[in-house]
Amino acid sequence: MQMNILFFGPNGSGKGTQGAILKEKYATPHIESGAIFRENIAGGTELGKKAKTFIDRGDLVPDDITIPMILDRLKQPDCKNGWLLDGFPRNRNQAVKLDEALQEAGLGLDIVIEIVLDREIAKNRIMGRRLCVNDNNHPNNIFIDAIKPNGDKCRVCGGELKTRSDDQDEAAINKRHDIYYDVVTGTLASAYYFKELAEKKGKIKYLTLDGSPSVKEVTQELVSKLK
């Protein structure tokens, strides 16, 4: 079953984890907008060179560079049976432009997924992350009962734990969440554009998931709704 999917969720919602699970289960590439920029810049593509001039100045890359870059990635052979796009769009105007560009390219969306999570819970999850020095993939979080560390040691292997500085920067977390949770000019505004399309035209399916349960429970709900 081909699925062209757009994924929304705040930092701390487990969006990246669920994206990785879908990638494995359905052999669907999980494409992050940030990775597209890095690949194009590293590869020295024309679009990458243009994007780099803006990034080097600390400016946002214009949509007329970003969207063609995304389309180029979605046209790659590994996306022929579907794809999962994460990290773009981030406002309603970008959503409209992306929707139009996808349709013109024959890459119309099938499904939009929104992981819903209370903002305070999302922030606590980020600040509660602890990284195992032996393996970053060992999940430890002081605010999630199912994966609480064993004291100050990794719950999986007993290794030492550390924190990432950006996970403890509450001001930076709040700034990212300000952008995401803004339903007028932020990321949720772009998600709701697609929700309106789903309700009015019925051409795409809009799925909402409760992000508060365990990873396993969220995955079960997601897989069930994708059937």
Residue map of PLM features:
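Glycine-rich phosphate-binding loop of ATP-dependent small-molecule kinases
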Residues: 1-227
